[in-house]
């Protein structure tokens, strides 16, 4: 007899957000350095503001409806981080929340659906394509890897590790390229060989979730 599927409850979601916030705070200087090389250098302070706002939110807000909880978290992120990263993170959280409205627990299928709509939302909102050297180059292969792993019957840990590996590979694949989208594209060849800050932030987030 197969074991019952592991479900993710509200406390696990809160704990994951707490780990993500702590990781982003810890990597603030690293992300600032990456962003200074190719952009306006505000990514570190932006993620720090978002992390502080989200921590306050998760410590004071019931999470009995994870859809509503995540959707509101997206609005908090958008208000706290008035930048591209804040907008994209908010879009992903709000799309994911809408996908699981009314649920108190999440299955692997729920998570796969959330990741898929989050990926689609970020691509639509950011108007970036694969190869443009943006967060999409790490996020899209990560989402595809997670969904494929879940559909193959892997457990959540296995699917998560495959997702992280795909995100890291996507980040590394575009590092030698010239940025073709967003503020980074303005500095031209200076972006060649530089790690994309959005890709780097995504990898930090995924590592924290899986920790």
Q: Model-predicted segments: where are they?
A:
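N-terminal loops that bind phosphate or other acidic moieties
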Residues: 1-211
């Amino acid at each position: 007899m197969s074991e019952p599927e592991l479900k993710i409850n509200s406390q696990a979601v809160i704990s994951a957000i707490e780990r993500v916030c702590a990781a982003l705070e810890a990597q603030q200087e690293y992300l600032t350095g990456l962003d200074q090389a190719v952009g306006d250098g505000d990514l570190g302070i932006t993620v720090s503001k978002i992390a502080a706002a989200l921590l306050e939110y998760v410590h004071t807000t019931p999470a009995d409806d994870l859809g509503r909880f995540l959707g509101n978290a997206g609005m908090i992120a958008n208000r706290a981080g008035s930048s591209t990263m804040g907008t994209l993170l908010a879009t992903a959280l709000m799309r994911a929340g809408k996908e699981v409205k009314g649920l108190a627990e999440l299955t692997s299928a729920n998570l796969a659906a959330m990741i898929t709509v989050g990926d689609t939302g970020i691509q639509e909102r950011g108007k970036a394509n694969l190869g443009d050297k943006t967060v999409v180059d790490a996020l899209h292969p990560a989402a595809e890897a997670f969904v494929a792993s879940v559909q193959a019957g892997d457990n959540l840990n296995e699917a998560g590790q495959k997702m992280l590996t795909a995100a890291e590979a996507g980040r590394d694949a575009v590092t030698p390229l010239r940025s073709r989208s967003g503020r980074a594209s303005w500095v031209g060849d200076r972006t060649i060989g530089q790690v994309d800050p959005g890709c780097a932030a995504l990898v930090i987030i995924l590592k924290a979730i899986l920790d």
